[in-house]
A protein has these predicted regions:
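HIT superfamily nucleotide-processing domains
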Residues: 1-116
Length: 116
């Protein structure tokens, strides 16, 4: 399992940095965003370090699927049956600020379009 010793999310996976965990599996970890953009805002990450979603899909396609499985389970447990949004920001121009692949799960309010 690849890790980057300087990566904040790798440190969360290792338990070196605290986070409010809401879901864990053999390949994923999910925790609440510290700056939520919706009443429910959870980040789902692979335990392995990949800089973005494209790299994750190329390197561990099964783990990429596991992120979506985790997102569904989180949405159910958070009571988001009316709907929720899943977002990957990939690269600086897309406002990715932590370069460890992560899936945003947002819900608990009506979501407008376009998002940004």
């Amino acid at each position: 399992m690849a890790r980057d010793p300087d990566c904040l999310f790798c440190k969360i996976v290792a338990g070196d940095v605290p986070a409010e965990l809401v879901h864990e599996s053999a390949t994923t970890v999910a925790f609440r965003d510290l700056q939520p953009q919706a009443p429910t805002h959870v980040l789902v990450i692979p335990r392995s370090h990949y800089a973005n979603a494209a790299d994750l899909a190329a390197g561990e396609p099964e783990t990429a699927i596991h992120l979506f499985d985790a997102a569904r389970a989180i949405a159910e447990s958070e009571g988001l049956g009316e709907g929720y949004r899943m977002v990957f920001n990939t690269g600086p121009a897309a406002n990715q600020t932590v370069f460890h692949a992560h899936l945003h799960v947002l819900g608990g309010r009506s979501m407008g379009w376009p998002p940004g």
